[in-house]
Amino acid sequence: MATRDSGGQSQTGRSQQGEEIEDVTTEASAEAAERHAEITEDVDDLLDEIDSVLEENAEEFVRGYVQKGGE
């Protein structure tokens, strides 16, 4: 009968571990989603800045790019 008691305790421990893992995973997912949103916003800002430079003086932008080794 001692085996049954420890088996029940083991299962309880496993379910608690599962809940802890799920909580950590949920927190990590929320942090990843927040970081993804920040990066997306930064990329959008950078693309907007490039667009405005190109609208103002595309020829100068291309010359500068080629001089730096771009093709």
UniProtKB/Swiss-Prot annotation:
Signal peptide: none annotated. The keyword tRNA-binding does not apply. Keywords: Coiled coil, Isopeptide bond, Ubl conjugation pathway. The keyword Coiled coil applies. Residues 1-18 have a biased composition (Low complexity). Pathway: Protein degradation; proteasomal Pup-dependent pathway. Pfam families: Pup (PF05639). GO terms for biological process: modification-dependent protein catabolic process; proteasomal protein catabolic process; protein pupylation. Residues 29-60 form a coiled coil. GO terms for molecular function: proteasome binding; protein tag activity. Residues 27-65 are annotated as: ARC ATPase binding. There is a cross-link at E71 (Isoglutamyl lysine isopeptide (Glu-Lys) (interchain with K-? in acceptor proteins)). Residues 1-42 are annotated as: Disordered. Strongly interacts with the proteasome-associated ATPase ARC through a hydrophobic interface; the interacting region of Pup lies in its C-terminal half. There is one Pup binding site per ARC hexamer ring. Protein modifier that is covalently attached to lysine residues of substrate proteins, thereby targeting them for proteasomal degradation. The tagging system is termed pupylation. The N-terminal unstructured half of Pup provides a signal required to initiate unfolding and degradation by the proteasome but is not needed for pupylation, while the C-terminal helical half of Pup interacts with ARC to target proteins to the proteasome. Belongs to the prokaryotic ubiquitin-like protein family. This is Prokaryotic ubiquitin-like protein Pup. It comes from Salinispora tropica (strain ATCC BAA-916 / DSM 44818 / JCM 13857 / NBRC 105044 / CNB-440). The gene is pup.
